[in-house]
């Protein structure tokens, strides 16, 4: 199991421009069984995604598809746990 902790690098106005695409990405990975839970941090400085993946390489591949990653919106800190 992994947790991705996202920290926004861009102003919230720019985050909001990519939010629907990010939500669509989340929906795809929930449907595939990759994601268990997700949501924004409070205060709104980023988000958290709990995911099920076979390896860190698989996590990196999934994160590479996130519009927030593609557009330089967020940094990702990945934590593996058992």
Walk through the language-model features, giving the residues of each:
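Conserved, structured core segments of small domains
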Residues: 1-82
């Amino acid at each position: 199991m992994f947790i991705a902790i996202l920290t926004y690098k861009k102003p919230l106005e720019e985050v909001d421009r990519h939010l629907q695409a990010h939500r669509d990405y989340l929906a795809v990975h929930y449907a595939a069984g990759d994601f268990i839970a997700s949501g924004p941090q409070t205060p709104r400085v980023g988000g958290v995604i709990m995911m099920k993946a076979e390896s860190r390489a698989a996590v990196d591949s999934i994160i590479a598809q996130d519009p927030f990653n593609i557009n330089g919106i967020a940094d990702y800190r990945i934590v593996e746990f058992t």
